[in-house]
């Protein structure tokens, strides 16, 4: 039995239903407009076998579930019309549950369907606590019944709700399963879980790819990665974790990033585990004090707005391209050359970066760098990165 086969056997024995063959994700993702973590959860449920016939049946089952039940935002009204005419309909959507204190009841909000204040049984938030913490994707059986005598109540009712993301986090399950693996085996599992094939990487390259995950795990960790194109610098923050956001290069504002004083609402740093800036060369604040506020936040995890001081835990990541060799760059300028001048030459800003990941040491990705083997379903692995230190 090869090392890969041993790892696969250990994964099946200790994490059944939590793993997926990563090539299946690529196979369906091309034609499915759903988050990777939702897709992989379904694949983990229906395609956890080595039997190609069972896998094919599972793929067809997942495709049918998505085509029949996934709600596209532009088809929300069509779905609601079908629900009204049939009296029942099953949908896949991101559901958030809030406690309405005034009415002393729990209410559900559907992201793509665009409806909210739908009464829901308290058994669901008690059973699946992530519904209360930003919401999770679910498959929901809806019923429609209009009551002439009570025109103010919602005609839409939730008959049944099943999460298609990890509904809660059991750290003890992970700890127990981890004991079956050596350190090197566990590193390979993590890399395959983010879609990479460790057999195509040397030891140094493995650790550099793992380093990209640190801002998702640590609070207030500031990372910079500059390097050639096609090395997947922004992929982790865009596709791998639902708890991070990728801000494309361009103008941003203090209100958007930190705190909106008009609306009295926290910005991105208070809503996400990690805020990543793509193409650092284009970062520009509309506000004159934007960079100073960013430096304060990077140093202490807090910032002042008006009379108040706000704290947040989001890590910051800066990624960008270096279009010339490192040797030339060092002779003519510095390794921070791609940054805007007001950031790249400000030693106070540079001192606040905890780690510079040398992107030129990461190989340009070829098809064989992407794994076809088993790894954790994305939502399972990121559930634990969300338990931040």
Task: Tell where the protein language model's regions lie, with residue ranges.
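A short helix-turn-beta junction within AAA+ P-loop NTPase domains corresponding to the substrate/partner-engaging
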Residues: 331-359
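Conserved small/polar residues in nucleotide/adenosyl-binding loops
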Residues: 385-389
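Extended alpha-helical interface modules used as scaffolds for assembling large macromolecular complexes
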Residues: 372, 380-384
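Conserved ASCE/P-loop NTPase catalytic core
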Residues: 190, 197-328, 333-337, 351
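Short acidic, Gly/Pro-enriched loop/turn segments at secondary-structure junctions
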Residues: 362-372
